[in-house]
């Protein structure tokens, strides 16, 4: 587009101020002015309740998370039954965990994973209560007896807690691999209910099947679920060799299909399960072997995050029909395992429109399952079976919160008055575009402004590539166009907040499958969040960002960062207790977070930290990739003096994430080592510290 003649006087470049406040504003009508005021209310009029509504905390967080009167995110560890004196302020937990030891804190580096075992207990109790109510209210003749699929979160304390909390309900475990089976066997043997089910899923070899049969000899209620027809031969051979009669289940491949991205394992082309012909073949083989009484369980799975009870009812009804057919064929059927699929509401919409939510409650899910099984069994005249579910996501998602710090943010565009003259040095065609842009701005002509801003930027970029303009000219033009856009009322582009976190390690589902989790500030919620931001992690990867948020947002309302040296700006990622820890990788060798276990107590802050552990150190993550930190340290130490070697030892022992603790930074640089800068002092220090340098590093590793 050629430069147009200037039809209004425009000021010279350096007459403009550094921000949009000094830009000539367009005239606004009363309606537009009212809308602008509504969009940017006075910060004093803001409240914690408004923040709660803005982030829809009650939608996705109830009954566990809410915004308290102090403007902090708080936790109700016992759900709706939590008393006012039992609520836990998450910001106070972070202050305790990350605060310096000299001030009574634990000195743990961030990021920080906060576990709430009381929430886990409440989830176990709520799931069992929902099914118990559905059974009693409908006169169902069986009972509910669930299992926790350990793949959702294999952390020792999580699994042990679930078994302990579930013991009164005969709650068991599900394993899908040999290490998971060993984990489940030891945990159930130590603290489980003798009647608790141990469901063995996944592909199997002789060693896997032998472990499962050994578990039966230990008195564990073990069921080997056939995923493939040929697994039956392995089970029969192992049982004969060990002299153990197995209890067998089958996974059916249903026709019912779940269309969401969590439903790829459902339908006739699903990854797992036996079709109708294969089911009949297994029954025939068992009958020939005189082992048909060993077949006692039917399992199916139509996908995680089942969106509606209508789809759930279809799948359960189809499976119940197969269950009844197996009973008719002579199998000693007693359990129907409905698999996973009990979803949670990540975005708080309570709808089936996206994969981020479900259109039912826990109670409605249980009622739909019980009704579907009971209806089919009644029609077929088959005794009501034990109902089992593998509801991992619904159990563990709420129990942990990932807390991380935003340590810097990109600055909005500005023009330095000292460099504003650069705009007057543009070439003639660029300068004509510039003056036309200014004239349109004075008139309040938004469309023409946008046109000339785009043309000016493109023309200047071309001339920069040709070497006509310098980098300073390019920066001045970019800043000017950004300020003009803001002055014309255009939405300010989101600012990038840099976070002390690895998305690949702590939020793997977010970049891998587009899963969204609620992310909000955990404090300052009594203040209006005046900045729209996106999050960028520490990794050297363009995928290491968060720019999609619940509610369809492409930015997150945030606050201006605190002045350097004051308290940090902490964000929390919620509902991530399932899968994220197991799936996280070591991109750029960033390891996992520090972890604290927090229980409700009668203390002054209503909580007690019952377990704390710093995250993996640099040495730990290097070792996981087959490096030898001890050897690396010795090689490096040969080229350093004593003070530097001590700093190296501390670096090996520290977490890979950034540290903003001045004392820690001084220690790492050797400023607090007490070492002299002269060579004699350094040599003496090296001699004194030679024996304890590596021990100091080893003590810092987890």
Curated annotation (Swiss-Prot):
Keywords, A to Z, come to:
Decarboxylase, Lyase, Magnesium, Putrescine biosynthesis, Pyridoxal phosphate, Spermidine biosynthesis
CDD domains linked to this entry:
PLPDE_III_ADC
GO MF, one annotated term: arginine decarboxylase activity
Q: What is its EC number?
A: 4.1.1.19
The protein's matches in Pfam families, at most eight in alphabetical order, are given as:
Orn_Arg_deC_N
Task: Specify which residues bind substrate according to the UniProt entry for this protein.
Answer: 336-346
Q: Which cofactor does it need?
A: pyridoxal 5'-phosphate; Mg(2+)
The tissues where this chain's protein is expressed are given as: Expressed in roots, leaves and stems (at protein level).
Q: Enzyme group, top EC level? A: lyase
The entry's family comment says:
Belongs to the Orn/Lys/Arg decarboxylase class-II family. SpeA subfamily.
- What is the protein name for this chain? Arginine decarboxylase 1
Q: Which organism is it from?
A: Oryza sativa subsp. japonica (Rice)
Q: What's the encoding gene here?
A: ADC1
């Amino acid at each position: 587009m050629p430069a147009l003649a200037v039809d209004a006087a425009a000021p010279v470049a350096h007459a403009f101020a550094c921000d949009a406040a000094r830009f000539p504003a367009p005239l606004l009508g009363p309606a537009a002015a009212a809308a602008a005021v509504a969009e940017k209310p006075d910060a004093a009029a803001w409240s914690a309740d408004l923040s709660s509504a803005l982030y829809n905390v009650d939608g996705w967080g109830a009954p566990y998370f809410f915004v308290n009167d102090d403007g902090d995110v708080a936790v109700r560890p016992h759900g709706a039954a939590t008393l006012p004196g039992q609520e836990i302020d998450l910001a106070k937990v972070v202050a305790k965990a990350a605060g310096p030891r000299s001030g009574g804190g634990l000195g743990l580096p961030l990021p920080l994973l906060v576990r709430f075992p009381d929430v886990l207990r409440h989830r176990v109790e709520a799931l069992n209560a929902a099914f118990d109510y559905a059974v009693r209210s409908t006169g169902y003749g069986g009972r509910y007896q669930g299992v926790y699929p350990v793949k959702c979160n294999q952390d020792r304390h999580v699994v042990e807690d679930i078994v302990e909390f579930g013991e009164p309900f005969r709650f068991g475990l599900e394993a899908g691999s040999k290490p998971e089976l060993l984990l489940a066997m030891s945990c159930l043997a130590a603290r489980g209910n003798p009647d608790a089910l141990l469901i063995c899923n996944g592909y199997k070899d002789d060693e896997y099947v032998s472990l499962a049969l050994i578990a039966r000899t230990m008195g564990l209620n073990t069921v080997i679920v056939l995923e493939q027809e040929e697994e039956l031969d392995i089970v029969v051979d192992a049982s004969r060799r060990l002299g153990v009669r197995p209890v067998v289940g089958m996974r059916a491949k249903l026709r019912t299909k779940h269309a969401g991205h969590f439903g790829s394992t459902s339908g006739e082309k699903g990854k797992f399960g036996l079709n109708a012909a294969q089911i009949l073949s297994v029954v025939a083989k068992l009958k020939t072997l005189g082992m048909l009484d060993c077949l006692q369980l039917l399992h199916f799975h139509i996908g995680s995050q089942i969106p509606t009870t209508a789809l759930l009812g279809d799948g359960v009804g189809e499976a119940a029909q197969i269950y009844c057919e197996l009973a008719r064929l002579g199998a000693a059927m007693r359990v129907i395992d409905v698999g996973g699929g009990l979803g949670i509401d990540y975005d708080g919409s309570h709808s089936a429109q996206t994969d981020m939510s479900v259109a039912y409650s826990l109670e409605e899910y249980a009622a739909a399952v019980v009704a579907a099984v009971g209806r089919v069994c009644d029609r077929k005249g088959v005794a009501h079976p034990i109902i089992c579910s593998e509801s991992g996501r619904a159990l563990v998602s709420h129990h942990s919160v990932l807390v991380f710090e935003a340590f810097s943010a990109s600055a909005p565009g500005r023009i330095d008055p000292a460099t504003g003259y650069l705009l007057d040095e543009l070439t003639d065609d660029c300068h004509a575009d510039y003056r036309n842009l200014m004239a349109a701005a004075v008139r309040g002509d938004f469309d023409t402004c946008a046109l000339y801003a785009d043309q000016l930027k493109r023309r200047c970029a071309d001339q920069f590539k040709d070497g006509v303009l310098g980098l300073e000219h390019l920066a001045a033009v970019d800043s000017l166009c950004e300020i003009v856009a803001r002055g014309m009322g255009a939405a300010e582009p989101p600012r990038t907040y840099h976070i002390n976190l690895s998305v690949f390690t702590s939020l793997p589902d977010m970049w891998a499958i587009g899963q969204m989790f609620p992310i909000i500030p955990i404090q300052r919620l009594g203040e209006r969040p005046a900045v729209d931001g996106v999050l960028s992690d520490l990794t050297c990867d363009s995928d290491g960002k968060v720019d999609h948020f619940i509610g369809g947002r492409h930015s997150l309302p945030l606050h201006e960062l605190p002045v350097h040296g004051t308290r940090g700006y902490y964000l929390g990622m919620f509902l991530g207790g399932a899968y994220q820890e197991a799936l996280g990788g070591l991109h750029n060798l960033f390891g996992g977070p520090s972890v604290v276990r927090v229980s409700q107590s009668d203390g002054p802050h209503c909580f007690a930290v019952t377990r704390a552990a710093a995250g993996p150190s640099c040495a730990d993550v290097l070792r996981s990739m087959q490096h030898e930190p001890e050897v690396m340290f010795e090689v490096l130490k040969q080229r350093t003096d004593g003070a530097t070697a001590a700093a190296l030892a501390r670096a090996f022992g520290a977490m890979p994430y950034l540290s903003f603790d001045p004392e820690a930074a001084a220690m790492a640089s050797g400023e607090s080592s007490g070492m002299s800068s002269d060579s004699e002092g350094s040599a003496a220090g090296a001699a004194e510290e030679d024996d304890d340098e590596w021990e100091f590093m080893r003590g810092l590793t987890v």
